[in-house]
Amino acid sequence: MAQSVTGIQIGGTSFPPAVKPPGSGNTLFLGGAGVRGMEIQGNFVKFTAIGVYLEDKAVPALSVKWKGKTAEELTESVEFFREIVTGPFEKFTQVTMILPLTGQQYSEKVSENCVAIWKKFGIYTDAEAKAIEKFIEVFKDQTFPPGASILFTQSPNGSLMIGISKDGSIPEVGNAVIENKLLSESVLESIIGKQGVSPEARKSVATRLSELLKESDHCVAGNEKVDECTKEAENKA
């Protein structure tokens, strides 16, 4: 599949069609990408560019329920994105700075959002509190100039590997691993979920997967078939 999925350029950030995430033996394809920004005094200010990558088997896994849905239907579906976030396949998220940011600013904002949601649903336990402490510790002394990236490898077993790149490369190993499924899922959901920080990335993922899923009737037979149908979808797009 990796060869037939196109890359995405967002400003000065290029998201290639496929990457091998830190700590992973798999090559993941680019599910979608978009910016995180905010309206400030009438201007849309872009803070980060975000790319979301998925393991090949995400397509047959999602096709069972979502094939034939339009990009608009998928964009509006809370359940669809929950299946991406919680699905039994690897995910990789690259957050690249457009404006400079400190590690403390980033980790505290992510942590606040996660804890608020967990407390709302009554799922915040000591395990999550310890995971948040470790998450904040990873970023404590970091600074991220424009072009630097924070990298999240999300394993189906619930582990979250955090990597840091200051030169645009993707390292083979990460800086830390946090064994907490809820945190791992929440990091991705905070980006492409219904209330996520990048509606543009959410729409991009929905649009690209809608095209792949259209051709997924014969994708469930294995990776070779997935690759074939992906090429067909790309040719039609």
UniProtKB/Swiss-Prot annotation:
Enzyme class at the top of the EC tree: isomerase
Keywords noted in UniProt: Flavonoid biosynthesis, Isomerase
EC numbers, comma separated: 5.5.1.6
Pfam family, one: Chalcone
Pathway the protein acts in: Secondary metabolite biosynthesis; flavonoid biosynthesis
Site entry (Important for catalytic activity), positions: Y106
Superkingdom in the source lineage: Eukaryota
GO biological process: flavonoid biosynthetic process
Catalytic activity line of the entry: a chalcone = a flavanone
InterPro entries: CFI, Chalcone_isomerase, Chalcone_isomerase_3-sand, Chalcone_isomerase_bundle_sf, Chalcone_isomerase_sf
Annotated residues for binding of substrate: T48, N113, S190
GO MF, one example: chalcone isomerase activity
Family: Belongs to the chalcone isomerase family.
Function recorded in the entry: Catalyzes the intramolecular cyclization of bicyclic chalcones into tricyclic (S)-flavanones. Responsible for the isomerization of 4,2',4',6'-tetrahydroxychalcone (also termed chalcone) into naringenin.
Note: Part of the biosynthetic pathway for all classes of flavonoids, a large class of secondary plant metabolites, many of which are brightly colored.
Protein name: Chalcone--flavanone isomerase 2
Organism: Fragaria ananassa (Strawberry)
Gene: CHI2
